[in-house]
Amino acid sequence: MIRLLIIDNHDSFVFNIVQLLREHPRVTYDLIREDELCGDEMTRYDALLLSPGPGIPEEYPRMMRLIAEGVGHYPILGICLGHQAIAQHLGATLHQLPHPLHGHPAPLVDIDHSDPIVGGITEGSIVGRYHSWVVSRADLPACLIPTAYSEGAESEQHELMAFRHRQYPIFGLQFHPESMITSSGKAYIEGFVSEVEKELRAQSLSLTTITSQI
């Protein structure tokens, strides 16, 4: 059973995420508000999910600390603000859209079908966008692999909608899988759960190998 910590970044959408996980047979979870984090939470959990939220990542210093501590140590999925926070911590920049998007349906394009989170999604599947900032694709750090884009809201340039870390089980989704607008929303969460399970199996195998050599 996966022990998942969900960070509530003061956004009502977090309860839709909880609804997706509430009856999941392989996940137990706790929900903690970002401003109530005390610093030792991840000693009790296997993976971290960062919720959407208003504002920009630097307004959430405790979430940013968890990301800094987590890279290379536990799986992370960031949604919307969480996606932006992971990218910014790893060296990406954000740029502001000309007009905020709220409940904007958009098709996913250029999907990386080898990706464990978005790879099983059909090209052109609709996702719900609720954001006024986006991760800049121009200077995306080399450690992040783009895995899906969306048609630009007000330009012909496609905007980054998903990424994964090149080395670690760290993933970002700019859109909201928990939105009713998003088709196959559960599939994105299930993809992350499967990746966490894969990571836990690898850790267990590594520990068994080390123990047998002692």
Indicate residue ranges for each PLM-predicted region:
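A glycine-centered loop/beta-turn motif at secondary-structure junctions
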Residues: 155-200
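N-terminal beta1-alpha1 cap of cysteine-dependent amidohydrolase-like domains
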Residues: 1-72, 79-81, 183-184, 190-214
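Histidine-centered divalent metal-coordination motifs
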Residues: 80, 131, 176
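Generic structural signal for residues in well-ordered beta-strands
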Residues: 28-31, 94, 146
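Cysteine-nucleophile active-site neighborhood
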Residues: 45-120, 124-126, 189
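Catalytic beta-strand/loop cores that center a nucleophilic Ser/Cys/Thr
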Residues: 114-167
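Short loop/edge segments at beta-strand edges and connector loops
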Residues: 33-34, 96, 129
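Short histidine/acidic/glycine/proline-rich micro-motifs that form metal-
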Residues: 54-56, 134, 178-180
